[in-house]
From Swiss-Prot:
Monomer. Glycans are attached at residues 17, 61, 87, 117, 140. The keyword Transmembrane helix does not apply. GO terms for biological process: sterol transport. SUPFAM superfamilies: E set domains (SSF81296). This is Putative phosphatidylglycerol/phosphatidylinositol transfer protein DDB_G0285639. It comes from the Eukaryota. InterPro entries: Ig_E-set, ML_dom, NPC2-like. It comes from Dictyostelium discoideum (Social amoeba). Belongs to the NPC2 family. GO terms for molecular function: sterol binding. The keyword Membrane does not apply. Gene3D superfamilies: 2.60.40.770.
């Protein structure tokens, strides 16, 4: 169950390409470059950081600089920097991925909008959660790269 929760938290952030530090109020950090295919215009995450038993709302608005018709999503998720909860590479346009990140293919230009709402179960263990998402297109160009980290209390 906790793996599914963490994957949902990380997956809804797949297209966040922002350069901010990671602290208790800023849980996302770009590990990409200005050449990435997706650029974020705005993001709203409430509450930040996520809270057990509470609804988490994420809204993302961004721009693709070119079409993306296929690719891969490599996702690594860890608990307390010790236990690997998830380490897989998935088809970016699979039904599972589309349910989380939106319909594939993605078209060039503004505006890509994605909204997700979910609740973290009150039974989720306290601790430090971290992850890395690297999205690439079918030519192995980076769509975006994201690090996520937060303490769940």
């Amino acid at each position: 169950m906790i793996i599914k929760i963490l994957l949902l938290i990380i997956s809804i952030s797949l297209f966040l390409n922002i350069s901010i530090g990671i602290d208790e109020n800023q849980i996302w950090k770009s590990c990409g470059t200005p050449q990435d295919i997706f650029h974020i215009n705005s993001i709203v995450v409430k509450p930040t950081p996520p809270v057990k038993g509470k609804l988490v709302k994420v809204n993302v608005n961004g721009t693709f600089i070119k079409d993306v018709v296929a690719g891969e999503a490599k996702i690594i998720a860890k608990y307390n920097n010790i236990m690997t909860l998830y380490n897989e590479t998935n088809d970016l346009c699979s039904p599972t991925a589309q349910a989380i990140i939106g319909n594939c293919p993605f078209k060039k230009g503004p505006t890509y909008l994605h909204s997700a709402n979910f609740t973290i179960p009150a039974s989720a263990p306290n601790g430090y959660y971290s992850g890395n998402i690297l999205l690439t297109d079918n030519f192995n160009n980076t769509i975006t790269c994201i690090n996520v980290a937060f303490n769940l209390q």
